[in-house]
A protein has these predicted regions:
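Non-catalytic DNA-recognition/assembly elements of restriction-modification systems
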Residues: 375, 574, 716-724, 739-740, ...
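A short, conserved, highly charged catalytic patch centered on acidic carboxylates
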Residues: 1-108, 122-126, 152, 744
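Preference for the N-terminal adenyl/adenosyl cofactor-binding alpha/beta module
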Residues: 1-9, 86, 112-115, 134, ...
Length: 914
């Protein structure tokens, strides 16, 4: 085993300066499978104290700081520092942490002497470290999993338990659904409510809420199958009845259950008769065989809703926001500040002042109000509540280590009444409310461990304000008054405009309106999620409300940027406070496609906090974050029919609209020519993105100028032409049906009479440069490419430069993550340089060098030549030479980063459009 081999190899060796980097690189690669350790971990990072010091190791993605010592050094003993102070290795690391930006501070500090690892969890900075010995690494390596997994083993366990819980709920659902009328919506509604109630009871018996473990099981176990239905009916009635209103003759086994309140058991629902299988599933599999007290309400809420949602079950599984992604929203929005405030309290040496500060912080937390306007199963609200309560428990622990608590006093102030939500699905509303109650019970149990006495959970005393309805048709202030609200959070639905229903399109047009109440012209071409941004911006006016939402990355790309962010800026003066640039969000459902998301935090309130861009695990401070999520001025690149600069016209290739009948594929070419040799004069190479990039062969029938007598003599061609006519006649589009009158011709014809440049409309995001190239006019370009007739080497050199690629990456749309090059956004808006004659000549020479380098590999496709791992040295050097020539023409330094380059291009663009 890798861990055993590593431990044996490092036994009895290790000195701080010479071997620590090798030690950690081998640990990460051999045991945890890190593929690029030089990227994953950084060594000797500077820390600016009153002198320059160096941090031994940092793992940014998992927020780990390493303080390494030589073999034999005592990790708990203070060591004299260069400034004369005496610090333990942990204190030394703490000092480094204190001077880092908050976003870069470690969650974990590891002190190590090659034989021992002391692990400090900074969620509990005063706690004792856990120690892992090198000699025990074979069995205990998993305790270092946090080095590579941000949420660590605990989250993995929560996930496993919650997913298992979802499976059990699915079994219960499947067992019950056969007893209900599956075609009756009301019956299915009763089934969903029944499942929620059963889960609450299963959790309550395992968590001790009912007073005695297995109480729910033991009560039902007394009943035979035929009596189970009535037993549940009676139990639900009792749970909904206060103790003083119950019959004094009530069966003692029922009377022992506490009053629940909260409305969970208020409605009379139809419960079907049980079968033996149903009884066994509930009592054995769901109750005795599983401990519900360990579930994560945040994860389970989503799993629960997905499990019981027939549409989701049919489409292939579960889909919910992970805890990690929720924290990407709430941590920079408010939670990091609260933790910093807590840590500041702990730094106060005066005990009286420290207690005052801790009480004030707890009071502040209890006054905060949170709103998720598309809350689904409540996972954002639930995780936010759990995070606040965990922090409050830390505060309570500190306070009551000094102050005495009255035996009847409840020290908890944060409560689920602070949380507001809107959700369109009635069942999801019930799940969200229940998930918050379970969260409350779990956190109350944690508080009880701190104060060493019990707090009554039942009857339920607090309620989350979850409202059922269409969030875009409800006045948000009616749900949560804006003067009371602090934060808007969530993951609203995103639906591309081409996939929106009539109702969704109507919602957008009703919301995305100008000062006169008229829909913006572009409102019909934006993602559905944009409506939530508009309503949030509207609500935060003249308040201190801050918002952060998970969204599709399309709202930060292409023409949607101007369509969405320009109105938000002009109407509401909002600014982006922080943002996560595009990251991939994988659904738990294996059948679902990957979703590419951004997270955007915004407000209209003035703030002194630095703006932060998160990208690939790095937190970068920005002067301004614009709608493209770039540190650059607020510039909106709008769709433009005519180029901003004096450059050749770009057009889309020719579109056949023929159902493939005017196209001759490579595998049918020989057969077609054999049957119709006289058609050869009308056959032209047909090149789209796939053909251009991958050296694939394809042809088309280009019948422009073909006379009736010529066509009459070509029976195979006539068959194809007739098929085109029939296909177009069946079209729903009137314009296409009209083109049935000219079935010999392409629907859209844009053949060039001169040599032209081809630009693929879609290209892999892994390429540094989009491959473009010159082709002769005999080639017919398909509508999968863009063409630039009459373009020169100079134009080619500019377009293939890193400057143009930086612009393209910033403003283009995306298909998943692939670049979507567009004429009206990317090309027509690009600010070209004004080179001298000498500079232009250099660009032409470097452009030719690119073509020459490609020509050295005639058997290689452009896809292979521009594969980052395969790109030939000559081609790479030619591109770099071209980059330098183009940057010189712009007056840019070759040391300029891509972000700096884009910022300068935005400035240049803004000047040109003024």
């Amino acid at each position: 085993m890798a861990a055993a081999a590593f431990a044996k190899r490092w036994e009895g060796r290790g000195y701080e300066k010479g071997e620590s980097q090798t030690f950690w690189i081998e640990l990460l690669t051999e045991i945890f499978g890190v593929e690029s350790p030089s990227v994953f971990i950084t060594f000797e990072q500077q820390a600016q104290l009153d002198h320059t010091s160096f941090i031994d190791g940092m793992i940014p993605s998992t927020h780990v700081m390493i303080e390494q010592k030589s073999l034999g050094k005592d990790l708990r003993q203070a060591i004299k520092q260069s400034d004369g102070s005496l610090l333990t290795p942990f204190q030394q690391a703490q000092r480094y942490s204190a001077v880092l930006p908050y976003s870069e501070r470690p969650r974990w500090i590891v002190t190590c002497n090659f034989a021992e690892f002391d692990v400090y969890d900074m969620e509990n900075p005063k706690g004792e470290p856990s120690r892992i010995l090198l000699k025990d690494l074979e069995k205990e390596y998993y305790r270092l999993q946090f080095l590579v997994e941000q949420q660590g083993i605990h989250l993995q366990r929560e996930m496993e338990v919650s997913m298992k819980a979802g499976e059990i709920v699915g079994k219960l659902y499947d067992a019950f659904v056969t007893q209900y009328d599956a075609d009756d919506p009301q019956s299915l509604r009763y089934l969903n409510i029944l499942c929620v109630r059963l889960v609450f009871c299963l959790y309550a018996e395992d968590a001790g809420i009912f007073g005695k473990r297995d109480m729910f099981h033991d009560f039902l176990a007394h009943y035979q199958t035929e009596d189970m239905r009535m037993a549940l009916v009676q139990l639900f009635e009792v749970l909904n009845t206060p103790a003083d209103k119950r019959s004094k003759y009530l069966n003692p086994s029922l009377a022992a259950f506490p009053y629940t309140n909260g409305g969970l058991f208020a409605e009379d629902i139809d419960i079907p008769q049980f079968t033996d299988e149903l009884r066994d599933t509930l009592l054995q599999h769901a109750s005795l065989d599983f401990d519900w007290s360990e579930i994560s309400p945040t994860i389970f809420g989503g799993v629960f809703e997905s499990t019981l949602n027939p549409e989701t079950r049919r489409s292939g599984g579960m889909h919910y926001t992970s805890i990690e992604n929720i924290h990407k929203v709430i941590d920079p929005l408010f939670y990091n500040d609260l933790r910093t405030a807590f840590e500041d309290c702990l730094e106060e040496s005066n005990i009286k002042k420290r207690m005052q500060q801790l009480h004030a912080l707890q009071d502040k937390m209890a006054e905060l109000r949170f709103f998720d306007s598309a809350c689904g199963s409540g996972n954002f609200l639930t995780e936010t509540y759990l995070s606040l309560r965990r922090l409050e428990n830390e505060i309570i622990k500190q306070i009551y280590s000094v102050e005495q608590l009255n035996a009847f006093e409840n020290p908890i102030k944060v409560n689920i009444h602070q949380f507001y939500g809107i959700e369109i699905n009635d069942f999801a509303v019930t799940v969200a409310t229940t998930a918050l109650w379970i969260s409350e019970a779990q956190m109350m149990a944690e508080t009880e461990k701190i104060i060493h006495h019990d707090i009554d959970f039942l009857p339920l005393k607090s309620y989350a304000n979850i409202h059922e309805g269409n969030s875009l048709q409800i006045a948000w202030e009616e749900v949560c008054p804006k003067e009371e609200l602090d934060y808007i959070i969530g993951n609203p639905p995103f639906v591309g405009y081409s996939l929106q229903s009539k109702e969704q399109k109507a919602d957008l047009l009703n919301i995305f309106v100008d000062e006169k109440g008229k829909p913006y012209k572009t409102a019909g071409k934006i993602d559905y999620v944009a409506a939530w941004y508009y309503k949030a911006a509207q609500m935060m006016q003249n308040t201190n409300i801050h918002a952060a939402l998970v969204s599709t990355n399309s709202i930060t790309q292409g023409e949607q940027v101007a369509a969405i962010w320009k109105p938000l800026k002009e109407m509401f003066s909002i600014h982006i406070d922080f943002a996560y640039r595009t990251f991939r969000w994988d659904s738990e459902a294996s059948l679902k496609a990957h979703v590419h998301c951004v997270i955007i935090g915004f407000s209209d309130a003035p703030t002194n906090k630095p703006k932060i861009l998160f990208d690939n695990g790095q937190a970068i401070e920005a002067k301004n974050i614009n709608g493209y999520l770039i540190d650059a001025p607020d510039v909106f690149v709008e769709s433009r029919n005519k180029a901003l600069c004096d450059i050749p016209l770009m057009t889309k290739g020719s579109q056949p609209t023929d159902d493939g009948n005017l196209i001759i594929e490579a595998d049918e070419y020989e057969d077609f020519i054999t049957k119709e040799p006289n058609a050869n004069k009308f056959i032209r190479p047909f090149v789209g993105a796939q053909e251009f990039l991958n050296k694939k062969k394809r042809w088309c029938l280009w019948l422009v100028g073909a006379s009736p007598s010529e066509l009459k003599a070509l029976p195979e061609v006539r068959k194809r032409v007739e098929a085109v006519r029939e296909f177009r006649l069946k079209s729903k589009k009137e314009a296409t049906r009209k083109k049935a009158d000219m079935p010999t011709l392409f629907d859209e014809r844009r053949a060039s009479t001169t040599e032209y440049i081809i630009v693929p409309r879609h290209s892999s995001e892994n390429r540094k440069y989009i491959p473009m190239g010159f082709v002769n006019p005999n080639i017919i370009a398909s509508d999968a490419v863009l063409t630039i007739p009459s373009a020169t080497l100079y134009h080619f050199g500019i377009l293939e430069s890193n400057v143009h690629m930086a612009w393209m990456r910033a403003v283009c749309g995306r298909l998943e993550m692939r670049y979507r090059y567009s004429k009206d956004i990317v090309y027509n808006n690009f600010p070209w340089p004004s080179p001298t004659t000498e500079q232009q000549a250099k660009i032409e020479a470097s452009a030719q060098a690119i073509l020459d380098a490609r020509a050295l590999y005639p058997d290689s496709s452009l896809a292979d030549l521009y594969d980052p791992t395969l790109m030939p040295k000559e081609l790479l050097q030619a591109h770099r030479q071209n980059d330098r020539a183009v940057m010189s023409a712009y007056g840019f330094s070759t040391k300029m980063t891509e972000s700096e380059c884009v910022a300068e291009l935005f400035k240049k663009y803004a000047e040109m459009v003024e």
